[in-house]
């Protein structure tokens, strides 16, 4: 077996399959592009779904990739086992209707055992198969020459993710030898069992069935191959490392943590877990941020925050008590740079995000500690013996407090923790995360009709909006038909078409179709699996037939407005980077006739000054009357020019480059203006946050921009008229009105306070005495909770003491407040517990501290009865 670095193993794999006629697909970003079924790209096949379900036909049916991936369903095990990771690389080869089981098995065996490639000893390799897959068993036995004792049948060897392609699989295992397990009585000591001796290195999935929505399985029109090899596992075998963490993918990170902490790796199991957690999590966080994700409280941003906080918590085991994770980013970049340059290219930005998050977490830990102390204090005051699971979960989820830390503090106070309650809260959170995506189909059932339509259809709409063409195919209800009549809908493929198919954010063209026998309207245009433009039409008159000569006419007005917005989007993209920084990446867009929408990654708020600057830049480029040059060139040449690519998009060897002078250069297949002056005017309509680290700008151009400005001007004029001033002086007039309003409110609050004080004389006169405790429970006139609190303040000022409960009716609701003096608290009275009982008696709920609480009710008619209960409650406390 060769001695190889991780980079060499990765490259050998890709070189092998390139030699076997495979196209090497680039690794896609970790943030999925247009796939709502997953938070992260979590496998090599995740980027290939469109090929497997037949919605897109690849140029080459043989493909291979090295795909960076994230899986976070088992975070708590990372660091505690030899091979659990949140970030990993999956090496895979794929066949879409080309070679099948025999080809996949022969390729895998050659790569693993040939001295030219990996050179494993064949005797150390075992395989597992699905019991009913006789074909695979025969191939392993007869084509490869494996003996029966090296072929293991396992019932779970069937790959099925629900609706879509599925099939049996065959896993390849490497025997690491007796040093990793030699107890023959161990029921798990076999390839496929839970042991460290037989290590799975490659899974070959034979997709041969459609799993249909009704639960049945039918043969696929085209059989596929999907394989996955974990790079980290392969490297651990080749480098003879006890675990994945002792390979060259992790050890440089661990060595850097040793330098920061002054603690050595390999001397303590507890310390080693911390080293492994940090080494794993920094890889995940660095790559995810580099691919556009940012820490937040939701979705993938929440996962990043959780990973960072978990690493920081474990760092305390290594006596690291200050921000440090950001210092590891350059190490990650250096390890991975030969194949993944994105971390090294964005080191400064990634470090900035991580350091900010670390600093925030150290502050949050202190806040969490303060809350924990309050929880412990309240538990002791109420004689509770256990910290509630909900409280433990809140500390864990919001403040990053590990359960173990909460448990230590609880033990110091003689308390226990509710582990079962905590686990129930964790399960609820996991269920919520699953249900958020449960109704989204992860893959479609593989179709046959469109995939078999291979005649080429040329798009001619870059240079014209009208064209005479021929109908190649008419489709109704997934069936090819010869004609479609008036009043019906159909799908059409033409020999040539000027109609743009929706892609790259630009909406599809609309327009008309005319033949000698019929007229139809184009409602929508999408890409068919074989890259033809597929038109959805409604027939308005007569009949359209296959083979008809037709006149195609794009709606020129809509097209003209759309292309203004598309070129403006390119200008905005560049202006965003110039204003906010090069870290800005496109996260989605919409280019339609009436507006444009641009989503982008950014980790902070955008100021009015920044928005104004971006808008000015775009308009300056419009008024400079810059020619828009569009040409096709090799992708290498485009990259040398500095062309921006759509984040997450895959491109061929020849690309279409759209250049707006020297200001904006992008790879784009859309339609654009010839000169920026054609845009006329650009106006930002709104800027909002739409998710974790993602913001959205909506804007208009041309006539729509003029209309927007005119509407704003009219609104300003109307406001000025109402204020009896000029438009120029409207801001000063509004400021004066706000100042006047603040003064009126101040005077009103003062008056209410005086009224409350005056009313208090009657309310607090002659309190009821129960067992030596003064009790006041009355209905009062108070417009809101603030006024009720003023009554409580007056009660405290008068030093009446005892127990106070006040209620007020506001419309169809009840406001309640209670207070208990310090001496009454010592006697065992609790304002929060009292008010909870009172509130339930008038249709509400609430609670609070021992000294003060407030609540609401929904049944004003029962307020009197609820207040009468106060005396009863006080007597019960004395019993």
From Swiss-Prot:
<dbReference type="InterPro" id="IPR002318">
    <property type="entry name" value="Ala-tRNA-lgiase_IIc"/>
</dbReference>
<dbReference type="InterPro" id="IPR018163">
    <property type="entry name" value="Thr/Ala-tRNA-synth_IIc_edit"/>
</dbReference>
<feature type="binding site">
    <location>
        <position position="672"/>
    </location>
    <ligand>
        <name>Zn(2+)</name>
    </ligand>
</feature>
<feature type="binding site">
    <location>
        <position position="668"/>
    </location>
    <ligand>
        <name>Zn(2+)</name>
    </ligand>
</feature>
<dbReference type="GO" id="GO:0005829">
    <property type="term" value="C:cytosol"/>
</dbReference>
<dbReference type="GO" id="GO:0140096">
    <property type="term" value="F:catalytic activity, acting on a protein"/>
</dbReference>
<dbReference type="InterPro" id="IPR003156">
    <property type="entry name" value="DHHA1_dom"/>
</dbReference>
<dbReference type="GO" id="GO:0016740">
    <property type="term" value="F:transferase activity"/>
</dbReference>
<dbReference type="Pfam" id="PF07973">
    <property type="entry name" value="tRNA_SAD"/>
</dbReference>
<keyword id="KW-0436">Ligase</keyword>
<keyword id="KW-0694">RNA-binding</keyword>
<feature type="binding site">
    <location>
        <position position="570"/>
    </location>
    <ligand>
        <name>Zn(2+)</name>
    </ligand>
</feature>
<dbReference type="InterPro" id="IPR050058">
    <property type="entry name" value="Ala-tRNA_ligase"/>
</dbReference>
<keyword id="KW-0648">Protein biosynthesis</keyword>
<keyword id="KW-0067">ATP-binding</keyword>
<dbReference type="GO" id="GO:0004813">
    <property type="term" value="F:alanine-tRNA ligase activity"/>
</dbReference>
<dbReference type="InterPro" id="IPR018165">
    <property type="entry name" value="Ala-tRNA-synth_IIc_core"/>
</dbReference>
<dbReference type="InterPro" id="IPR012947">
    <property type="entry name" value="tRNA_SAD"/>
</dbReference>
<keyword id="KW-0862">Zinc</keyword>
<comment type="similarity">
    <text>Belongs to the class-II aminoacyl-tRNA synthetase family.</text>
</comment>
<dbReference type="GO" id="GO:0002161">
    <property type="term" value="F:aminoacyl-tRNA deacylase activity"/>
</dbReference>
<dbReference type="InterPro" id="IPR009000">
    <property type="entry name" value="Transl_B-barrel_sf"/>
</dbReference>
<keyword id="KW-0820">tRNA-binding</keyword>
<keyword id="KW-0547">Nucleotide-binding</keyword>
<dbReference type="Pfam" id="PF01411">
    <property type="entry name" value="tRNA-synt_2c"/>
</dbReference>
<protein>
    <recommendedName>
        <fullName>Alanine--tRNA ligase</fullName>
        <ecNumber>6.1.1.7</ecNumber>
    </recommendedName>
</protein>
<keyword id="KW-0963">Cytoplasm</keyword>
<keyword id="KW-0030">Aminoacyl-tRNA synthetase</keyword>
<dbReference type="InterPro" id="IPR045864">
    <property type="entry name" value="aa-tRNA-synth_II/BPL/LPL"/>
</dbReference>
<feature type="binding site">
    <location>
        <position position="566"/>
    </location>
    <ligand>
        <name>Zn(2+)</name>
    </ligand>
</feature>
<dbReference type="GO" id="GO:0006419">
    <property type="term" value="P:alanyl-tRNA aminoacylation"/>
</dbReference>
<dbReference type="InterPro" id="IPR018162">
    <property type="entry name" value="Ala-tRNA-ligase_IIc_anticod-bd"/>
</dbReference>
<dbReference type="GO" id="GO:0005524">
    <property type="term" value="F:ATP binding"/>
</dbReference>
<dbReference type="Pfam" id="PF02272">
    <property type="entry name" value="DHHA1"/>
</dbReference>
<dbReference type="GO" id="GO:0000049">
    <property type="term" value="F:tRNA binding"/>
</dbReference>
<keyword id="KW-0479">Metal-binding</keyword>
<dbReference type="InterPro" id="IPR018164">
    <property type="entry name" value="Ala-tRNA-synth_IIc_N"/>
</dbReference>
<comment type="function">
    <text>Catalyzes the attachment of alanine to tRNA(Ala) in a two-step reaction: alanine is first activated by ATP to form Ala-AMP and then transferred to the acceptor end of tRNA(Ala). Also edits incorrectly charged Ser-tRNA(Ala) and Gly-tRNA(Ala) via its editing domain.</text>
</comment>
<dbReference type="GO" id="GO:0008270">
    <property type="term" value="F:zinc ion binding"/>
</dbReference>
<dbReference type="InterPro" id="IPR023033">
    <property type="entry name" value="Ala_tRNA_ligase_euk/bac"/>
</dbReference>
């Amino acid at each position: 077996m060769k001695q190889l670095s991780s980079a060499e193993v990765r490259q050998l794999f890709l070189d092998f399959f390139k030699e076997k006629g495979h196209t090497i697909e680039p690794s896609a970003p970790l943030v999925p592009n247009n796939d709502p079924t997953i938070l992260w790209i979590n496998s090599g096949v995740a980027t290939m779904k469109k090929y497997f379900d037949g919605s897109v036909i690849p140029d080459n049916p043989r493909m291979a990739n090295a795909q960076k991936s994230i899986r976070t369903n088992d975070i708590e095990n990372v660091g505690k086992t030899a091979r659990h990771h949140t970030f990993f690389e999956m090496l895979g080869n794929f066949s879409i209707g080309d070679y099948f089981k025999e080809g996949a098995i022969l390729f895998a065996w050659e790569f693993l055992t040939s001295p030219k490639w990996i050179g494993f000893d064949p005797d150390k390799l075992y395989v597992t198969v699905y019991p009913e897959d006789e074909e695979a068993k025969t191939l392993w036995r007869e084509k490869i020459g494996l003996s029966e004792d090296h072929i293991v049948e396992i019932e779970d060897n069937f790959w099925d993710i629900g609706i879509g392609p599925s099939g049996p699989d065959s896993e390849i295992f490497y025997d690491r030898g007796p040093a990793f397990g030699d107890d023959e009585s161990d029921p798990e000591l076999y390839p496929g069992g839970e042991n460290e001796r037989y290590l799975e290195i490659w899974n070959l999935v034979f997709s041969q069935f459609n799993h249909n929505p009704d639960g049945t399985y039918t043969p696929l029109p085209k059989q596929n191959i999907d394989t996955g090899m974990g790079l980290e596992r392969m490297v651990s075998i080749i480098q003879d490392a006890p675990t994945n963490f002792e390979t060259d993918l992790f050890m440089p990170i661990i060595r850097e943590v040793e330098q920061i902490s002054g603690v050595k790796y390999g001397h303590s199991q507890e310390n080693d877990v911390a080293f492994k957690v940090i080494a794993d999590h920094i890889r995940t966080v660095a790559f995810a941020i580099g691919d556009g994700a940012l820490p937040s409280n939701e979705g993938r941003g929440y996962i990043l925050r959780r990973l960072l906080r978990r690493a920081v918590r474990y760092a305390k085991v290594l006596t690291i008590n200050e921000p440090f994770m950001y210092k590891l980013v350059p190490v990650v970049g250096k390890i991975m740079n030969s194949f993944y340059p994105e971390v090294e290219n964005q080191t400064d930005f990634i470090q900035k995000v991580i350091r900010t998050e670390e600093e925030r977490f150290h502050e949050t830990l202190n806040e969490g500690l303060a809350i924990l102390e309050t929880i412990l204090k309240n538990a002791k005051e109420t004689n509770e013996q256990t910290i509630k699971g909900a409280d433990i979960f809140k500390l864990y989820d919001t403040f990053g407090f590990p359960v173990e830390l909460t448990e230590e503090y609880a033990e110091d106070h003689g308390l226990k923790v509710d582990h079962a309650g905590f686990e129930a809260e964790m399960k609820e959170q996991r269920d919520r995360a699953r249900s958020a995506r449960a109704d989204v189909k992860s893959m479609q059932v593989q179709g046959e009709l469109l995939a078999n339509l291979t005649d080429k259809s040329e798009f001619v709409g870059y240079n014209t909006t009208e064209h005479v063409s021929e109908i190649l195919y008419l489709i109704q209800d997934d069936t090819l038909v010869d004609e479609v009549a008036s009043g019906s809908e159909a799908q059409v493929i033409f020999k040539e078409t000027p109609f743009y198919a929706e892609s790259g954010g630009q909406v599809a063209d609309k327009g008309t179709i005319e033949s000698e026998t019929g007229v139809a309207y184009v409602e929508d245009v999408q890409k068919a699996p074989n890259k033809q433009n597929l038109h959805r039409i409604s027939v308005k008159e007569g009949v359209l037939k296959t083979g008809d000569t037709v006149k195609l006419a794009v709606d020129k007005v809509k097209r003209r407005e759309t292309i203004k917005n598309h070129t403006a989007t390119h200008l905005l993209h560049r202006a965003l980077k110039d204003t906010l920084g090069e870290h800005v990446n496109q996260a989605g867009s919409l280019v339609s006739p009436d507006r444009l929408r641009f989503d982008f990654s950014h980790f902070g708020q955008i100021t009015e000054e920044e928005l104004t600057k971006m808008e000015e830049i775009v308009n300056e480029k419009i008024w400079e009357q810059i020619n828009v040059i569009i040409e096709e060139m090799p992708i290498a040449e485009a990259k040398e020019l500095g062309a921006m690519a759509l984040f997450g998009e895959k491109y061929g060897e020849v690309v279409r480059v759209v250049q707006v002078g020297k200001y904006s250069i992008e790879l784009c297949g859309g339609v654009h203006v010839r000169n920026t002056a054609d845009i006329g005017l650009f106006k930002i309509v709104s800027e909002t946050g739409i998710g974790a680290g993602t913001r959205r700008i909506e804007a208009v151009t041309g006539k729509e921009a003029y209309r927007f400005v005119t509407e704003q001007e009219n609104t300003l004029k109307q406001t000025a008229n109402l204020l009896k001033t000029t438009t120029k002086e409207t801001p000063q007039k509004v400021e004066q009105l706000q100042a006047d309003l603040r003064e009126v409110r101040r005077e009103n609050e003062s008056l209410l306070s005086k009224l409350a004080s005056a009313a208090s004389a009657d309310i607090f006169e002659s309190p009821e005495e129960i067992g030596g405790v003064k009790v006041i429970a009355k209905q009062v006139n108070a417009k809101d909770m603030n006024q009720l609190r003023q009554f409580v303040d007056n009660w405290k000022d008068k030093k009446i003491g005892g127990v106070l409960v006040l209620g007020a009716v506001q419309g169809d609701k009840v406001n309640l407040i209670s207070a208990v003096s310090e001496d009454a608290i010592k006697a065992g009275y609790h304002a929060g517990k009292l008010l909870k009982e009172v509130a339930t008696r008038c249709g509400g709920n609430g609670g609070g501290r021992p000294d003060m609480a407030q609540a609401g009710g929904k049944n004003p008619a029962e307020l009197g009865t609820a207040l009468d209960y106060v005396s009863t409650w006080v007597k019960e406390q004395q019993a």
